[in-house]
Amino acid sequence: MSVYYIVLAGFLLFMALVPFNAGQQYIDDDIEVVSSCQNGYVQNAGCDQNSQVNIIITATLDGVVTALDGETGEMIWRYEDAPLLRGTLSTSDPIDIGGTSLQLMPTLDGRLFSYTHNTNLIEPLPITTDSLLESTIRLGQDAVAGGKSVTTKGFDLFTGEQKYECSMESCGPGDTETPKNPIILIRRTTNSIRAMDTLRGIERWNLSTAEIGVTLAGGITSPTLVSDVKILLQPPDGVIVAVDKYNREEWKTNVDGHIVSVWQVYGNQIGEISIFDPSNIFTTQYEVMQREQHNLQTQSSLLYMGTSNGFPFIIQSPKAKNNLKQRMNALPELSTMTELTNPRFCTANEETRSLAYNVKDETLRLVLHNAFRHSQSKAIEDKSLSGSSARRKLQIIASDTEVSAQRIGTENLRSTSVSKSGDYGYLVLESEPQRVKFKVNSPITLMQTIFSYIFNPTAVVSFLAGLIGVTVAVVYNKIAKSSPRMIEHLSSTESAETESASHRTRTTSFAPTDDEIERFVEEGSDLSTTPIGAIHRKPLMPIEKSNIETHTQPQIKPVQRLVKTDIDTDEDSFSNDEKKRLLRNRTISRSSLEGFTSRFANEFEVKKVIGHGGFGVVFRAQSITDMNEYAVKRIAVADNDKARNRVLREARALAMFDHPGIIRYFYAWEERPPKGFQEKEDENLLGKIKAEKLAKLHEIKKAKKHTSEGKRVRSADTASFAESFAMPPVVGNTTDAENSWSTSAKPQEVGAKRTTSESKLGLHGGSDRTTAELKEESVAFSESDEESDTTEDSSSSDESPSSSSGSSIDDEPKKYNSSSGGIEFVDGSDDVDNEAVKETKKEIAVIEELSIHNRAMIVETENQELEVRERNDTGDCAYLYIVMQLCAEKTLEDWIRRSKTMESRPLFTMKNWIKQLASGLEYLHNKGFIHRDLKPGNVFFSLDSTHGHQILKIGDLGLATKTDGAPKITVRQDSDSSAKHTKNVGTRSYMSPEQLKHQQYTEKVDIFALGLVATELIISFSTASERIHTFADFQKGDIPAILDNVPESRDFLLQLTSLEPSERPTAHEVATHKFLQ
């Protein structure tokens, strides 16, 4: 060990003695440039002139380089050169190669891609301009010329004056004096080839491609630059937009050309604004933002596909270039000479001149034919020769590594153009990262790992501690198994109390647990003679807050069996597993006997489906007894305690609360209908409601006197969102409901579990569009779209008692057509339907979504592996009903979305609302609970509200958790009581810094969320991005600049959103704060 420290000290001493010259910079051609204050190249901290240079350099496909002022977007200078792409190969029609139609797609770095019409595949050909030139020379049929050339030109950065040029012929003219302004270097790499007829000298075909690179002489190349604005690109449109950190436009400029490269010079640094980064593209920036909000890995782009006057071209990313180069090197050399046994020279006349220009040339055909032989399209065609195969979806072959390639479908294409006319451009994103497979290390690697642990004292101690722990666990397990009855009788009193508690939380229709079956089997009970009624549970007694009488399901007496059959006598020979299964089936079968009645159906009349999401459906129902309307939430529960405890959490929390600022709870019960009973009841119920709504819609439309063919909305009787929604799944049937996410690969068959925002979008058609369409057209996300409910259970605001099926409709619906045959929404200014029509159609859409219960599927994801199972295969389930106070069919989130002006948000009213929320939180905290998911979507308006006085109520307590007393560090109710809460639950946009860091947290997380909600009430954000960035600043501890617009509220909001929880006020201190008085 001492030798190690001696060597380390010697190395550090050596490094300290080595001189370091920070004033020298080197450029690519090894010319040393000395930094100084006078030459304007590098502005050091010690120089007097320290103004930051901010210039944007753009290169377009027509060969024009433009310099823009980074502060204003005004053009500083412009330099024109030859186009980067030209020639007959780049503007040719499809070529017929042996019966295969190929469309050539050249790349700017001199390679050729092909689009094969037969296989609908885009892939690189194993050929470049260099190999094409070599092949045509070897064939000797044409006179060819071409090659690669590199030209470097130096320009004054500020004036655009050309100082010098260096090419293959010469370099000059030089300047003996040191320039006063920085010099920008523009390097152009050109690959060109021309083929001519040897007799007539007529050009047959040609191709020229070029790339442009920009560097700063004496400057520093940096991958990322720190700037006050962000540059966004619309490459096909030639538009550059500068936005601030709140995504507000600073300036916008059109450079009149298809943009292929952009650089930014800031100070003495230069960095490329890559067109392969989706965050730099105007149309894909929101998708990147969404992936960050959902903690998903950002996809990078391998290729950029664009068109020039309607003809395609490709730009390869540096990664794609390197991968393709290594892959092509592994292919065998094209044996071009051996393919042509009898070369023929082509004659030239007026017709052949035209044909030559259309790439009708035998030499080129031969070269392309040999290249095509090695393509995947050729292999696909060979396999499908025997029969006619259906046309495949478009796919793009991109090299993943030097030895493999990946197929990229249209779902990974992103449009970069806003304009619907002119040329187009698409980013070709990499496929989603695959799950890392287990890999067995080689023996050498394994031995190295073992020795690294042997010589690491910490690792040895950890290994021994783990070994001792495993040994103790094994010994304890053996002792426990050797005397199960002794351990069972040690605490008979505790066991009786546990059994009593278990009785209180089950209904008569629940099947016995595995432990109970195990006890019956071990005690040798005769399952054939055990009466079903002997295994009976006491029903769940709801906590009453009204005089409504509770009822239990009637006990069904089993038929007495007088004769014992042969099957009964053979049960003694059954195995333990068979006895368990038999007992469970017989217990479950009691619910199939005649006489079952639904308490919900007997006591309530459903008026409307007002919400759905996660695992629940919320009905607006009228009590037959007192004729009052309530919000009744129904949740499907699997046959196990863990699932029941999860869904009972909200009911148990609500039962403890009695506060005007919290949704009121009345009572709850459970039902366990026979298999298929609930599905049939839902079908009848929803069909009846739909018929009533259709009749209402017919009457409304009948009264309308004018319609426009171009502005009409599709008839509501065809409006179905069933392809994008399924009945909520059963709680407890997912493998890991806390950590799994779901998706609908086939919406008409698979009903995915949704987040709050996704469910809301589905209600008004936003989710009907396919993923590819949304991403391709890059529709801007609505204000609620960036929110992702990463809840540990599936309660969402859509299940809350006032969630309206149409409450999340945007005020300005965008025009699009549903891909699933749903309602077609048109622009709000042209919509001839009134609000009543819209509302009725939304309700019908929800009903039709719920009506596909029998086709519902459960989609589970664990470690990115999809598992799809039919709902009916998940086992029997019970239904938990929670009766709650009915609120207005709008949330605070809906109000915020509609109230965009400051006039609609008087500060006095906003203060009153914040005070109401603080009062509700104070009550929760005093009761020892933390809400953990406070957001506008979980705040509702009471039906007792008036125009002058709105009463707010906090709802959706599915994530509310009990605290452990004085420290108020949250503890999971369904886990060990010593486990501190660090789980990342709630909505990410409204999480506190300690939640985002997975640290221990207290009730102060609700105060932080309240601060964000207060900010959203006081400040009217112009865009969703502005709100996201503001909240992100709060979560990072930065002070958002937008607070300067509300100086009277600034200190109050900063107190609530303090980075340190101890510095945030309590809910009582917020409610009594002088700012709110």
Curated annotation (Swiss-Prot):
Quaternary assembly: Forms dimers with HSPA5/BIP in resting cells. Oligomerizes in ER-stressed cells.
Key words, A-Z: ATP-binding, Endoplasmic reticulum, Glycoprotein, Kinase, Membrane, Nucleotide-binding, Phosphoprotein, Serine/threonine-protein kinase, Signal, Stress response, Transferase, Translation regulation, Transmembrane, Transmembrane helix, Unfolded protein response
GO cellular component: cytoplasm; endoplasmic reticulum membrane; nucleus
Topological domains, Cytoplasmic: 475-1077
UniProt organism field: Caenorhabditis elegans
Protein induction: By ER stress.
Pfam families according to UniProt: Pkinase (PF00069)
Main location group: endoplasmic reticulum
Coiled-coil spans in chain: none
EC number from the UniProt entry: 2.7.11.1
The name this protein goes by in its record: Eukaryotic translation initiation factor 2-alpha kinase pek-1
Function: Phosphorylates the alpha subunit of eukaryotic translation-initiation factor 2 (eIF2alpha), leading to its inactivation and thus to a rapid reduction of translational initiation and repression of global protein synthesis. May phosphorylate eIF2alpha during hypoxia. Proposed to have a role in alleviating endoplasmic reticulum stress.
Highest taxon in the source lineage: Eukaryota
Cellular compartment(s): Endoplasmic reticulum membrane
